[in-house]
Amino acid sequence: MKFSAKKEALADKLSLCSSIAEKRQTIPILSNVLLKANNGNLTIVATDLERQLSLIVSDCSISDDGETTVSARKLFELIRSVPDDTELNFEVIENQLEISALSFQADLAVLPVQDFPFVDLEDHNFNITLDGSKFGKVLESTSFAMASADVRYYLNGLLFETAQKKINMVATDGHRLAWGSYSHSEDLEDKKLIIPRSTALELSLIHI
């Protein structure tokens, strides 16, 4: 695998992935992000076995397709430390990811891709495209009412409902309730699901 990208194309996405990958993991591979270069894009994947986040970096140059996994925290801290507008070069050489620019070179240890545990989505075939701005506003106006450690686990999250051309979100901690809704451009399948609190908080960052 060999590719290049500027700091700005990677830093924000790695920050989001790191927030999932580095939660005091006891399984080493879960502290890593998967980097996959193919079809002219770089895909960054992080999981904690409950959540999986996949982000695509299109503003990059792929020389050789491939994939590897590397420490999310170390990679993010390294990229964050370089000056803005720095062009970074990445190449997997044996068991290391070599990262270089005009002024430095660093090597990070990698772990086998086959050990990376993808969340099985085959049984979850509900897909929806959301308007990030509208979704974010309703999420912000409702998520504050979620419970944080209630024994009634369903309160530690947010109800997400699709019905016809409406998207509704409801949160409550048993004492207060917040509801929000916005119109969707297409007719939607009627669905109800609970978004866990941790996922809702991550989504509040990603929608921006």
What are these regions (language model features)?
Residues M1-I206:
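Structural preference for solvent-exposed beta-strand-turn elements
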